[in-house]
Regions:
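Mixed-charge (Asp/Glu-Lys/Arg
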Residues: 1-124, 129-134
Length: 134
């Protein structure tokens, strides 16, 4: 998977400790408004749901535009039942997967958003798996 440009905005926050003075590894997004990076990020998120090679064909088979197909069948929508929850869960999982893969150099399989039982339903089970070969 290509490294999305927004990953350059992820920075480590030093000096964060838990109540027992145990240091925590924390990260934050330190961003500046850049429409090109935001567009790249949006495309990166969309690719978590449906690969480019399938998108146009699936839309055509359903007699929909790509945008209509994404809204009706793929991307959780904020105005639908459970849509906001699914969107929030998905973006969190994608952000953490990106952190593990592109910042911490782990291998992260990307398949959780593919072939879901419904666009507004998160699949239950393991959210993120990350591993590293030594």
């Amino acid at each position: 998977m290509d490294r999305p440009q927004y990953v350059n905005w992820i920075v480590r926050e030093d000096g964060v400790v838990f109540e027992d003075q145990q240091p925590l590894n924390c990260y934050r997004l330190s961003y500046v408004r850049d429409d090109a990076i935001l567009d790249d990020w949006a495309l990166h998120i969309r690719k978590q749901y449906v690969p480019d090679g399938e998108l146009e064909e699936d839309a055509a088979l359903n007699k929909l535009t790509v945008e209509e197909y994404l809204r009706q069948y793929i991307i959780p929508q904020k105005g639908e039942p459970f849509g906001p929850t699914a969107r929030s869960n998905d973006i969190s999982e994608i952000l953490f997967a990106d952190l593990f893969e592109f910042i911490l150099n782990y291998e992260v399989p990307r398949c959780k958003q593919h072939n879901r039982s419904g666009k507004n339903e998160s699949e239950h089970g393991t959210d993120i798996i990350a591993y590293r070969f030594f």
